[in-house]
Amino acid sequence: MKKAYYGDFGGQFLPESAMFALNELENAFLKFSKDKFFKKELSELLKTYVGRPTPLYFARNLSKKYQHEIYLKREDLNHTGAHKINNAIAQALLAKKMGKKKIIAETGAGQHGLATATAAALLGLECEIYMGATDVQRQALNVYKMELLGAKIHAVQSGLKTLKEATTAAIQAWVGDIKNIFYVVGSAVGPYPYPKMVTHFQSIIGKECKMQLQKLNKKVDYIIAAVGGGSNAAGIFYDFIKDENVKLIGIEAGGLGVDTLYHAATLNKGETGIIHGMKTKVLQDDLGNILPVHSVSAGLDYPGIGPLHAFLFESKRAQYHAISDEECMQALKLLCKEEGIIAAIESSHALAFLEKLCPTLKKKSVIVINLSGRGDKDMQMIREYKKGVIYG
């Protein structure tokens, strides 16, 4: 496998002006990811600041309902409320080691923006966040938190005003001042080395999960995670990829249905194309134009996907299914009532797949769901969904 690719997917599809920064980043990542002092400092931050390891929680009531052993990897209990901080704090620390004074990031649901702003405050870095204007409205709480932490928010007004446009704006800002800015990419997407680097920093989820299962003397049969760009899924999948006995299942945003125009099911409905500096699966028309996407979740409405997932899909090492807005919201309510946990809308897509998977299983199975974030940020969206405001 070529270093910049997963099979046919990955690469560096950016202007020549960006190549210096990508090479600089690759060299720094390769150097510091092996540096014992960097690793020790990051490990200490993850333990004492982020709150790792996160628990692997046996969901007793869900297990009783579905007649299988269901465990939740509780990334929602991290500082800032999601898995995003694992990667953001590592990249921010890397930026500091590289002598950068300013970091920028794109964000959809606001969790990566919040994590980046948090890391910037801790490490004394200037921070600017690019967020689609639509997402600024539906994630107002996270926007206020980011501003409170000292970040400057750019509400992107172009296109659908969501994650794709925010990412494009962040890349443009980075390329415009490439020597001084460090771009903290939030998902396992973008030009190499970003997909590899983000997966590396998020792989702590799967490493912990593996150790926790061993302590419980359990062998996992299925691992399920929501997929937008794909960082939480890459994080929990990575250490299990070589174990063919473990079935890996990614859940895309089915929106109003994959046979409508209102979804973000990139692997189920997309084709190979180029987006945000990488070759991957993309939702595009016959002319190669990126299609508009929809999801009730601000963190999953992305028309591309990380190249690792495109490779796992093509090689059939992982399965990818779509869950609709309605199925997701029903799962969110079910977890609240059964386990007393309010999950993020993104994570609830993964939970919803239990309803489809469990009736098909012939033997009692051990199922791990990556609960990638908590639902505090989604309260307004959940209320609007119940009222039917989202769809008019």
Swiss-Prot record:
It comes from the Bacteria. Its EC number is 4.2.1.20. Keywords: Amino-acid biosynthesis, Aromatic amino acid biosynthesis, Lyase, Pyridoxal phosphate, Tryptophan biosynthesis. Pathway: Amino-acid biosynthesis; L-tryptophan biosynthesis; L-tryptophan from chorismate: step 5/5. It is an enzyme of class 4 (lyase). The modification N6-(pyridoxal phosphate)lysine is found at residue 84. PROSITE patterns: TRP_SYNTHASE_BETA (PS00168). It catalyses: (1S,2R)-1-C-(indol-3-yl)glycerol 3-phosphate + L-serine = D-glyceraldehyde 3-phosphate + L-tryptophan + H2O. Disulfide bonds: none annotated. Its cofactor is pyridoxal 5'-phosphate. InterPro entries: Trp_synth_b_CS (IPR006653), Trp_synth_beta (IPR006654), Trp_synth_beta/beta-like (IPR023026), TrpB-like_PALP (IPR001926), TrpB-like_PALP_sf (IPR036052). It holds the Pfam family PALP. One of its GO terms (molecular function) is tryptophan synthase activity. One of its GO terms (cellular component) is cytoplasm. Belongs to the TrpB family. The beta subunit is responsible for the synthesis of L-tryptophan from indole and L-serine. NCBIfam families: trpB. Tetramer of two alpha and two beta chains. HAMAP family: Trp_synth_beta. This is Tryptophan synthase beta chain. The gene is trpB.
